[in-house]
């Protein structure tokens, strides 16, 4: 099973979700993309440092924009916000598009830490980790 995490710029939330999912859940493979990626942008320094500290994982790559091929390959497309979910559905359609909180049985959006301090990044990281732990307990992820 392939899972695709989507956020705005593919510099904070979706790369964190990708690494958390891949490092903690080994029955599927995750990737991440952004809806509005600035050419040459990379994962934020704060997100990178947290992932290095928590998982020993150095994410050093350019942000990638969501493309048709990504949509075709993924069984689940998981956004961080309702607005992102609507945008993905507008562009590509989408019976397989959910927000992370929706899949976890919660409502609302995962806060965007972009431009904030490390404390906010840590809160976002912790929230994403908690939500991913929750969704991977469901039968649909236990195949």
Residue ranges and their predicted role:
Residues 1-72, 140-143:
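Conserved active-site segments centered on acidic
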Residues 31, 77-78:
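Short, charged/polar low-complexity linear motifs in solvent-exposed/disordered segments
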Residues 70, 81-82:
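Helix N-cap/beta->alpha junction signal
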Residues 76, 82-143:
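Phosphate-binding/catalytic loops
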């Amino acid at each position: 099973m392939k899972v695709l995490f989507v956020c705005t710029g593919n510099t904070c939330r979706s790369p964190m979700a990708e690494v958390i999912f891949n490092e903690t859940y080994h029955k599927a493979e995750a990737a991440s993309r952004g809806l509005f990626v600035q050419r040459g942008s990379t994962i934020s320094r704060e997100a990178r440092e947290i992932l290095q500290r928590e998982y020993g994982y150095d994410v050093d790559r350019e942000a990638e924009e969501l493309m048709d091929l990504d949509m075709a390959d993924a069984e689940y497309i998981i956004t961080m916000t309702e607005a992102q979910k609507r945008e993905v559905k507008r562009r590509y359609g989408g019976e397989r598009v959910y927000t992370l909180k929706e899949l976890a049985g919660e409502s609302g959006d995962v806060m965007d830490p972009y431009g904030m301090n490390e404390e906010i990044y840590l809160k976002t990281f912790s929230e994403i980790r908690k939500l991913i732990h929750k969704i991977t307990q469901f039968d649909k992820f236990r195949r």
